[in-house]
Every structure is written in structure tokens, then in C-alpha cells.
């Protein structure tokens, strides 16, 4: 009887949660369940588990302090907190409190599959007043990561390659997180974000007042998220692939009727996909993402051009770097089938010519007006195309001369002439001497096959 009484009292104790355990293991539901199971089996150990939970919470709090201290050390912490509470934090503030601070929501979407910086399902949130874009843990309700809206520099909406069902990856690239421009010393960069949405309607998307959106109005999840982002972005807009810029020569692998906008490539041993967009070249979707914005590209060239593949070399320079800061990024094993499309894209945007790099940077900052720059860029592009054709013809002429030099025997000038047409020997004989023979060789070298045609006509 007494044993049954103990069990009933234990069950009664566990019918309500223990606050210390809830706080300590909020982010680890499986571990929290094991703790409660252990308490159920040995209820006399409840005080012990509470002490362990409190100690765990203190450790978590201790480890959460260092990231915020360097930012606020020299900048009046009290004033900083007041700014955060008013929603007016400065754009260059790097404290996690910017995105974690409590703020009214304008939009949220549950069960969003994130790939970067964490691979898990989270709730996507956009705070009101162009505040921040962030991801919240659906179990612990804690903000995992985020970025202030005014720190976002590029937003891409790209079709996920090689999927049987249409999906889209949203890629958020904050300032100093494009893989090209490093943050200034002492300044922290927000992490890039990548999440995936399906082509169908949003199943769990809500407005700021809690009303469900996107479920019955015919708007897809991709279109809904894109619209919300465009309404809140201050420095850019969502960029999608445009077939006027580039489309792959090969269709989607699993959806043959659809055009593909990606190209497979390798950076070192890491495989990824290249997208040639209206604002730059993107390589993803694995860490670290790289976005080659037009204003950072010095020039683009080809190397290791083989029968089936070729490499793309992109020379880039950071915004705050001098001429000596230029670095090259090689993207290899690109299929030859896409060479023509990539080459047309590069020439259309003037990326093959390093002399146009300053014009691209000027356009980024809107120096001298956009229209004048576009006209200048168009003229420069035409000149660049003509120059490339001239260089091509020059290379062909040099190759032809090299082949003729291989046939030339320096041992005897007179005998070397005999290696040509025998009819020419019969007509000309040896009367004109060595100087005339050398003159004939020069004519043949310059005119090639045309010299042979002239000789035959004379016969």
C-alpha cells in the first residue's frame, strides 16, 4: 500500500513541468525527456536533477556573454540598450541583440528548411519596420540567427538544380559575407542564409496579426516570400535568373521540358553550381557561398580549354582593396556545351576586359549617371568584341606560320625550294639566286595558300 502511494505521488509531481529543467534543456527535447523519465523512475532524485539543471543554465548563460561584450565595451551599453528597445539600432552594430530583440512581426513562416548556416527546420521571421530577417527555433522558441535588413546586400531566388519537384533556394548575402569583401578589422559579419521553399502554396505562413496568408489566394510560397522580402529590403531587391542573361544549353536533368539556369563547376575539390545573373556570378550552395558582384570583378578569362571541359578564372578585387589586392578564383570542369552561353554573358557585361572594371565600380555607386555609363559600357563592349576577333585572327596567322616553319629545312636554301611545287622549279630554274628564293619564301609565308594559287595560274 505504501509503495503504491509513493508511485501515485510521483505521477502527480510529474504532471507539471519543473521550471529549472525546462529552461536548461529547452533546446534539447530528447535529453529533457530522458531527465523526466529518470525522475519518474527515481522521484527521490528530483532535487539532484534540479541542481544539475540550474548549473547547466548557468553554464549556458556564461557562454552566451562573450559575443556581446566586445561590441558594447566602448560604446555606452545603456544607450545601446535604449536604441535596441526603440528599434533604432545603428546599422553598423553587430550585437546579436539586434536580431534577437523582441519586436512585432510583419511575417512568419513555419517549418522552413534551412541549409545555411544550420541544416534544420526553423521558423522564418521578418520583423516590422524593416527590422530584421531571422530564424527561430520551433522547440526552444529562441532566435538561432538573423541579419538586420539594412545589412543585406544581395538576395537571390534560384531554382534548386536536379530535383524532380520544383524548389527554390533563397540566398541572403549580408555585407562582408560574399566571400570577396572581408569585414574591416574588429567588425563582425553576419552569416549568409540559405533556405528552400517549394513551388506550391505556403502551408504555414502568417501576417503580423496572426492571420494565415498565401494558402488560398493562388500565390506560391516562392512568390509570397519574394514579395515580402522586396517590401522590406532597403538596399537591394530579390534577383532571379533571366534567360536574357544566361540559360544553360542543357535542360533540367529531371524536368526535361524546363530550362536550366545553372552550370556545374568545381572550386578545388568542392562541387557546386554557377548562376550567371544580372548583378553578378553566384557559386553555391555549400559553405562558403561566393557572389562575384560586377563591381568586384576585374576580368574573366578561360584556362584549360579541352574538348569536353574548360575552366573559368575570375579576377576580383574587394571594395576597400588596392590594385595589389586582386585575387583569382578558378572554377573548373565546366561543360563545353555551356561555353557559348557563358562567353556571350561575359562579353555582354564587359567582364572580359579589365579596363572596364572602374566603369562597373562607378555604376555600383551611380557615378556620372547610369545612362551615360550604359552607353559607355556598350561602346566598350563593341570595341572589346572587335579586339577579340582581331586577336583571334592574329593567333591563326601565327599558327599558320609555325606550321610552315616546321616544314622549313635550314640546311640548303636551294633544295628547300624544291620541296614545294616541281613546276615552279622548271619555270624559274636557278637563275634568280638565293635572294630571290628567300623572297619567294617570305611571300609564301605571308600569303599561304594564295601564293600557291598564283603559281598555278602562272603555269
Swiss-Prot record:
Subcellular location: Nucleus; Chromosome
Function: Histones H3 and H4 chaperone involved in the nucleosome formation and heterochromatin silencing. Required for the deposition of H3K56ac-carrying H3-H4 complex onto newly-replicated DNA. Plays a role in the transcriptional regulation of the cell-cycle dependent histone genes by creating a repressive structure at the core histone gene promoter.
Recorded GO CC terms: chromosome; nucleus
SMART domains on file: Rtt106
Organism the protein comes from: Aspergillus fumigatus (strain ATCC MYA-4609 / CBS 101355 / FGSC A1100 / Af293)
Disulfide bonds: none
Key words, A-Z: Chaperone, Chromosome, DNA-binding, Nucleus, Transcription, Transcription regulation
Gene: rtt106
Stretch list, region Disordered: 67-99, 373-459
GO terms of molecular function: DNA binding; histone binding; nucleosome binding
Extent of Acidic residues compositional bias: 398-408, 424-440, 449-459
Polar residues bias: start-end ranges: 85-97
Family from the record: Belongs to the RTT106 family.
InterPro entries associated with the record: PH-like_dom_sf, RTT106/SPT16-like_middle_dom, RTT106/SSRP1_HistChap/FACT
Chief place where the protein resides: nucleus
Record's keyword annotation contains DNA-binding: yes
Metal-binding found in the keyword field: no
Highest taxon of source: Eukaryota
Subunit structure: Interacts with histones H3 and H4.
Identification of the protein by name: Histone chaperone rtt106
Amino acid at each position: 500500500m505504501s509503495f503504491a502511494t509513493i508511485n501515485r505521488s510521483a505521477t502527480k509531481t510529474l504532471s507539471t513541468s519543473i521550471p529549472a529543467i525546462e529552461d536548461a534543456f529547452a533546446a534539447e527535447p530528447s535529453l529533457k525527456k530522458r531527465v523526466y523519465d529518470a525522475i519518474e523512475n527515481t522521484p527521490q532524485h528530483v532535487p539532484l536533477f534540479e541542481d544539475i539543471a540550474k548549473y547547466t543554465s548557468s553554464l549556458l548563460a556564461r557562454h552566451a556573454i562573450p559575443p556581446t561584450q566586445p561590441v558594447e565595451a566602448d560604446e555606452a551599453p545603456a544607450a545601446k540598450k535604449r536604441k535596441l528597445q526603440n528599434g533604432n539600432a545603428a546599422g553598423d552594430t553587430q550585437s546579436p541583440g539586434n536580431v534577437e530583440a523582441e519586436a512585432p512581426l510583419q511575417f512568419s513562416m513555419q517549418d522552413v528548411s534551412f541549409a545555411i548556416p544550420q541544416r534544420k527546420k526553423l521558423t522564418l521571421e521578418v520583423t516590422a519596420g524593416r527590422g530584421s530577417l531571422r530564424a527561430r527555433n520551433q522547440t526552444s522558441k529562441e532566435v538561432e540567427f538573423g541579419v538586420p535588413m539594412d545589412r543585406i546586400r544581395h538576395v537571390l531566388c534560384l531554382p534548386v538544380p536536379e530535383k524532380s519537384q520544383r524548389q527554390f533556394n533563397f540566398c541572403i548575402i549580408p555585407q562582408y559575407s560574399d566571400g570577396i569583401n572581408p569585414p574591416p578589422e574588429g567588425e563582425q559579419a553576419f552569416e549568409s542564409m540559405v533556405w528552400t521553399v517549394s513551388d506550391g502554396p505556403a502551408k504555414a505562413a502568417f501576417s503580423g496579426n496572426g492571420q494565415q496568408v498565401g494558402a488560398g489566394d493562388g500565390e506560391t510560397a516562392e512568390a509570397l516570400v519574394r514579395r515580402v522580402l522586396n517590401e522590406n529590403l532597403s538596399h537591394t531587391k530579390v534577383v532571379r535568373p533571366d534567360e536574357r542573361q544566361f540559360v544553360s544549353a542543357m535542360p533540367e536533368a529531371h524536368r526535361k521540358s524546363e530550362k536550366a539556369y545553372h552550370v556545374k563547376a568545381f572550386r578545388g575539390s568542392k562541387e557546386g553550381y554557377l548562376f550567371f545573373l544580372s548583378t553578378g556570378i553566384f557559386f553555391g550552395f555549400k559553405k562558403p557561398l561566393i557572389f562575384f558582384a560586377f563591381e568586384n570583378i576585374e576580368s574573366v578569362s578561360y584556362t584549360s580549354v579541352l574538348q569536353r571541359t574548360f575552366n573559368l578564372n575570375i579576377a576580383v578585387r574587394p571594395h576597400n582593396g588596392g590594385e595589389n589586392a586582386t585575387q583569382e578564383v578558378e572554377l573548373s570542369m565546366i561543360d563545353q556545351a555551356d561555353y557559348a552561353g557563358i562567353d556571350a554573358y561575359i562579353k555582354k557585361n564587359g567582364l572580359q576586359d579589365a579596363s572596364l572594371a572602374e566603369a562597373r565600380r562607378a555604376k555600383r555607386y551611380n557615378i556620372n549617371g547610369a545612362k551615360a555609363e550604359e552607353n559607355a559600357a556598350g561602346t566598350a563592349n563593341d570595341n572589346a568584341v572587335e579586339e577579340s576577333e582581331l586577336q583571334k585572327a592574329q593567333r591563326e596567322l601565327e599558327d599558320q606560320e609555325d606550321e610552315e616553319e616546321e616544314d622549313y629545312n635550314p640546311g640548303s636554301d636551294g633544295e628547300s625550294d624544291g620541296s614545294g611545287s616541281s613546276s615552279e622549279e622548271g619555270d624559274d630554274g636557278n637563275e634568280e639566286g638565293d635572294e630571290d628564293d628567300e623572297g619567294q619564301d617570305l611571300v609564301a609565308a605571308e600569303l599561304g595558300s594564295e601564293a600557291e594559287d598564283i603559281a598555278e595560274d602562272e603555269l
